[in-house]
Amino acid sequence: MIKVPIMVATFDAMTRGDLDFHQQLLYRDSLRYGSDDILGAVKDSTEIPLSWLTLLSITMSDNTASLWLQALAGTGTTVNQWLQAHGFDSTRVNSRTPGREENRARYGWGQTTPREIADLLMLIREEKAVSPAASQEMYRHLTRSYWTGEALSQIPPWVQVASKVGAVDHSRSEVALVNAPHGDYVFAVITKEQADTSWDPSNEGWTLIRKVSALLWQHFEPNLPWHPAPGAERFKP
């Protein structure tokens, strides 16, 4: 979920004029991170608009795009400075960030808490992150998630949800801000030191996220009962 703060820092750089949403960037093979990324499949020396990077980072959770954005925004140090300045004391980028090596070894690329990542989505929803215009576009990005198999699977498809998933071997996480018919609600689930490290849909962390999401929908919208249709899991990434 550290890609949300990276997105915010990128839009902050665009608002300051250091970057431009429509600027063309030159992709090089040296930027590739992992074999599963869409951006990593692009040919060397291809021109890519910055707007594609922000979309891929949030919608697909593309690691290559996200690390590139982290560098373009001014490195993890710049992202962390924005977080500190806006009251986020526990959310930090660790990877490729001087002084964060111990945290990187313990937590991975980044770290946050359920409260802080939920607060950050609320800040964007209330158009208070960077600027109203930037917040509006960031919120649109967050409502286009490709990863609909967990929290989103328990919410009707006709309800808009801003969300971001996260997963490493010993943790599964998701934050979601639901624009429900009777009012918004936000929640975040982050597992820690999880014993089940499988990548199957039945993973205990993902199962927990689905259960929490279903319970919250039933709680906040008791007069709008909804369940995934039989066989819906066949069409989940």
Residue spans for each PLM region:
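Mid-domain, small-residue-enriched loop/turn segments at the edges of structured enzyme/sensor domains
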Residues: 46, 54, 67-126
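Active-site-proximal beta-strand/loop segments in catalytic clefts of secreted hydrolases
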Residues: 29-30, 58-61, 72, 95-96, ...
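Structured C-terminal helix/loop/strand segments within mature extracytoplasmic catalytic/sensor domains
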Residues: 72, 76, 119-149, 159, ...
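Flexible glycine/proline-enriched surface loops and loop-helix/loop-strand junctions
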Residues: 49-53, 60-66, 97-105, 171, ...
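Short, well-structured active-site flanking segments
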Residues: 12-32, 76, 131-134
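Active-site SXXK
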Residues: 1-25, 57, 187
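Solvent-exposed, acidic/flexible segments
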Residues: 1-4, 18, 43-51, 58-63, ...
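Extracytoplasmic
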Residues: 1-2, 20-22, 83-88, 107, ...
